[in-house]
């Protein structure tokens, strides 16, 4: 039996590893292996887009262990903060939050109660509720405008008013794994490229664009296969998406800068930023040791849409805009050793109200499967953990269909 897997990201690599003992598996990838987890090499490896993991990421932790990388796994309590009106405020500890001057004590109390309760809520029950109206009902205009809207605008831009409340509840629950000193997150020391390389070992990976056809049998680039697993974004399926009446899902694009700075911006790992071309500063070397890289490394994260001006403008122009807005953090052009711009056209679905109804099943047609960002494990927020789980579950579905189990 022959199986084609389209996409060598976490979902595709996981599915391939689950199926390789049952069939001849060929993985097709038009870009670098790893997908959104691919890395940049500069004498060391670092992800093109910021990544970290959480204690609850059981699927990811099991995969790291399975591929012998447990010794590389490190956990650290990091600081988070917010930049507003020219100042950076740490919001890492209860004391930090109490000292924050841009919210009243009542606002802070309401926010704390909301954070605690969000951990216990069933996200699916809130799928049809717009996030902005839900927040306005709970907090009124002040907390919505001063705290939530800058983050929603930075993440979703003009689509912020369409996003489901379920997405925010999941986001808050994930990010509320706080200790008294801050938030605990994990990382693979020296980079997630180690996991990608381990998962890709002993797999047949073909670097090529793919044309999938159904003409009696499934074929990829003219070669017949008994089954095809597609792990890419739905728009890249072209006519097949219409043929099988797949849901029309809106995607957002990632525009992320990775920069080397002469000096650290602050001692905070993650700073949410208002009114800038980037929505967050993620200072990687406030998380991992400076000695691993020999330079201060900072991500500047922004989101657009496939049609948006930020995604489509030249990288050089994007770099100029990012560097302009960095000046408010006392970073001058001479302080920047280098900057690289990375773009992903379909980095995440926009989790609009009603998105639950658009989740794609694994089995689309006899011999044709879809898994990835639009699968149930990645609802209502995509993650490395969800992508790995989708890869395992689609493989289990295929094995059951073909009598492998």
Where are these regions (language model features)?
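Conserved flavin/dinucleotide-binding core of flavoenzymes
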Residues: 290-405
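Mid-domain catalytic core of redox enzymes
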Residues: 213-316, 321-330, 334, 359-362
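Glycine-rich FAD pyrophosphate-binding loop
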Residues: 6, 20-41
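Beta1/beta-strand and adjacent pyrophosphate-binding region of the FAD-binding site
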Residues: 1-11
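Active-site/ligand-binding neighborhood in enzyme catalytic cores
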Residues: 87, 103, 110-211, 224
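Feature captures the FAD/FMN-dependent oxidoreductase FAD-binding
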Residues: 62-75, 79-90, 138-144, 201-207, ...
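Conserved Rossmann-like nucleotide-cofactor binding loop
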Residues: 11, 33, 235
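Dinucleotide-binding Rossmann-like beta1-alpha1 core, especially the glycine-rich loop
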Residues: 44-123
């Amino acid at each position: 039996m022959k199986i084609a897997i389209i996409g060598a990201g976490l979902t595709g690599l996981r599915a391939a590893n689950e199926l390789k003992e049952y069939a001849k598996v060929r993985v097709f990838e038009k870009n670098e292996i790893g997908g959104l987890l691919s890395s940049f090499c500069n004498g060391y490896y670092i992800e093109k887009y910021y990544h970290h993991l959480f204690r609850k990421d059981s699927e990811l932790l099991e995969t790291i262990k399975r591929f012998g990388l447990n010794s590389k796994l490190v956990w650290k309590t990091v600081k988070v903060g917010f930049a507003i009106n020219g100042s950076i405020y740490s919001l890492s500890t209860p004391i930090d939050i109490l000292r924050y001057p841009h919210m009243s004590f009542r606002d802070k109390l309401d926010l704390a109660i909301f954070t605690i309760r969000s951990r216990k809520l069933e996200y699916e029950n809130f799928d049809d509720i717009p996030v902005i109206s839900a927040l306005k009902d709970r907090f009124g205009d002040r907390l919505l405008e001063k705290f939530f809207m800058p983050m929603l605008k930075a993440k979703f831009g003009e689509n912020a008013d369409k996003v489901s409340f379920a997405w925010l509840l999941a986001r808050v629950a994930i990010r509320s794994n706080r200790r008294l000193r801050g938030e605990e997150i994990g990382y693979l020391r020296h980079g997630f490229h180690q996991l990608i390389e381990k998962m890709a070992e002993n797999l047949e990976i073909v670097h090529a664009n793919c044309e999938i056809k159904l003409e009696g049998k499934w074929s990829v680039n003219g070669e017949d296969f008994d089954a095809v697993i597609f792990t890419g974004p739905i728009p890249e399926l072209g006519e097949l998406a219409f043929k099988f009446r797949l849901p029309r899902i809106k995607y957002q694009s990632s525009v992320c800068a990775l920069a080397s700075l002469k000096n650290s911006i602050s001692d905070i790992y993650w700073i949410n930023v208002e009114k800038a071309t980037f929505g967050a500063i993620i200072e990687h070397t406030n998380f991992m040791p400076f000695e691993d890289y020999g330079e201060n490394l900072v991500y500047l994260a922004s989101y657009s849409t496939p049609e948006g001006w930020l995604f489509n403008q030249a990288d050089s122009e994007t770099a100029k805009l990012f560097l302009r807005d960095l000046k408010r953090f006392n970073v001058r052009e001479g302080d920047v050793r280098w900057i690289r711009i990375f773009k992903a056209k379909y980095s995440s679905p926009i989790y609009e109200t009603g998105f639950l109804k658009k989740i794609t099943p694994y089995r689309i047609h006899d011999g044709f499967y879809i898994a990835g960002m639009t699968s149930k494990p990645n609802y209502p927020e995509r993650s490395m953990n969800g992508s790995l789980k989708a890869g395992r579950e689609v493989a289990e579905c295929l094995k059951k269909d073909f009598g492998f189990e």
